[in-house]
Amino acid sequence: MRRLFLLHLLLILPLTANERGFSFTNAPLQFMPLTANTFEPRVGLIWHANDNRLRLDIGNSIDLIQYHTDAPGARFTIGSDFFTYTLLSGEKNFHFPVDAVDYLFGFNASYADTLRNGVLSSRLRLSHISAHFVDGHFNGSTGTWKDGLNPRVYSREFFDWTIAFAPQSNIRGYVGLYYLWHVDPTTLPQWMVYAGGEYSQPITTVLHGYTAYQFTATGLLPRHEFQAGVKLGDWTGRGTKFFFVLHRGNSIHGEYHDITDAYSGFGFNIDL
């Protein structure tokens, strides 16, 4: 964690100087989060209909610095990601004990170029993920952890590289890979690959229907993630998504990383 923070500073601080080509930016995020990918910053909630659990996402990704090139269609940015995804248990009287929480932070670099037949973009992230059980996973009356699962160390530092192509503004396909350069437990695979796509269609000027899917080869079980719904607002800007979701494969939560998780449900995200 300390190494990741220091590397972040070493990359950012030299750019704050008035070097030619670099400047701070307050423009919208250049590489939009992958809709079906779990490991993206979001603000929202998903209800698991089959087991009455909830997933709460809190986080954001911001571009901080941009590089100006002579090519009018090419853009390069550097930014940061900070978010958590939390597993909650649904109980009566609107009680939602926190079972497990995973947090991710790091930084990213993205590049986009407008070609004659579409937009080619790429994003490289260097991130840290850590996972923890919380008091909702503990049985206070017996003094034991629930389901016989005690807390265990789960931590990883990794590179995540995505290449995407959008032939039109409402269609995007992508491929990517993870390289885990430090991981605990060490039995986890160091390489993972994924591929996916997104499609949206305007219904009115402020309402868009969409669908998205991602397949991830994790080295444990393949993970399938599907999402379909509508968005109120600008498709590439601020708005609110309401959607149906399907998940099949290993759990996204580090404390449950070797346990199969299959659910369907409904959710919403607020795109900032």
Predicted regions and their residues:
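Short loop/turn motifs that connect adjacent beta-strands in outer-membrane beta-barrel proteins
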Residues: F31-T35, I65-I78, T114-L120, A166-I171, ...
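Transmembrane beta-strands of outer-membrane beta-barrel pores
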Residues: L45-A49, L64, F82-L88, D113, ...
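Outer-membrane beta-barrel "beta-signal"
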Residues: F226, I259-L272
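Solvent-exposed loop/turn segments connecting transmembrane beta-strands
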Residues: H48-R55, N117, W181-W191, I203, ...
